[in-house]
Amino acid sequence: MAGTSPASGVRAGAVFCSAATWWVLAARKGAALVFCPILPQSENHHRADIPVPWAEALRSGCPDGARIRCRPVLRPSTQGLIRRGQFSAALTERLLTTLCAELRHRQQEDAPAPRFSTRSPG
């Protein structure tokens, strides 16, 4: 059907891969799709990382030991991505909660520092 997004039937928690990266769909924002990258095992961890349980990795087809980096990446569609599976509702809910918390942390970090007035005694 013309004008229909190729992602119209896809819901949050859907797992995709591109040539180099695995992705999980977190939400829709207007006409755009919000994805979070799924990273392979490494020593570098971030506060916004969620480990993917082995059963979820097996069910969704993503690499064992992977983790979700709760960092929003906007894409206009799923074009160029291959759907691999679906995370459970529980993991998807945890993803959304962690993503919202990370966005709040970033807002606080990016906010201008409060100015304190210093008054000399006397």
Protein language model regions, located:
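Mixed-charge, Lys/Arg-rich low-complexity intrinsically disordered regions
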Residues: 1-10
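Short, functionally important structural connectors and interaction interfaces within domains
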Residues: 2, 30, 42-44, 60, ...
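Compact nucleic-acid interaction/catalytic patches
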Residues: 12, 18, 24-58
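Structural detector for hydrophobic anchor residues on beta-strands
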Residues: 20-21, 68
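C-terminal terminal-subdomain/extension
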Residues: 56-122
